[in-house]
Amino acid sequence: VQGDIFPLEKGVIMRAIWKRELQAYFLTPTGYVFMGVFLLLSSVMFYLQIMQARSSDLPTFVGQMSYLWMLLSPVLTMRLLAEERQRRTDQLLLTSPVSLSGMVLGKYAAAYTVMAATVVLTLGFVAVVAVYGRVYPAEMAVAYLGFILQGGAFLALDLFISGCAKNQVTAAVFAFGANFVLW
């Protein structure tokens, strides 16, 4: 029988990596800066595209908000693996009982959690439009699903680049370039 002898223990370790990375996002300014800048820019876009134009075309707005993923996802991922290599703590992680894929998935899950929390905060825009206009729930669900999946794709690409880069700045620059090419 092939497979892991202790799969549950590895899941616990992966969860510990997720928790550690999530704490790192909010014990340092990174998570707050990402969320704040994303919400500031999306609020400006909301004001200009929806409020000022007196429009209720939220799916188009959500689609255009996707540009922010391209610009800001490198902020979330630049430190995930490049910092481990720079601080030389990557060897400690690589010799831990968790697999390489478990380590990467734990880090990805933490970045995805921060991104998902940011997306939840943008639902306030939908509430504002619902008060003054008409919102089609199925249309919004599909728009937000695409928005979240696109953000996840950018995070995955940027995490890969962070794993290839020697430092955080290089990871961010190449991730931004790759996002631009992917877009």
Language model regions located:
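Helix-loop-helix units of permease transmembrane domains in multi-pass membrane transporters
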Residues: 80-110
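Transmembrane helix-loop junction
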Residues: 20, 24, 83, 95, ...
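Aromatic- and glycine-rich beta-strand/loop motifs that create alpha-glucan
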Residues: 9-31
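Long, hydrophobic alpha-helical segments
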Residues: 61-83, 118
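Secretory targeting signals
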Residues: 45-47, 58, 110-170
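Residue-level signature of the transmembrane alpha-helical core
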Residues: 18, 36-39, 73, 108, ...
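Hydrophobic alpha-helical transmembrane segments of multi-pass membrane transport/permease proteins
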Residues: 29-49, 64-74, 177-181
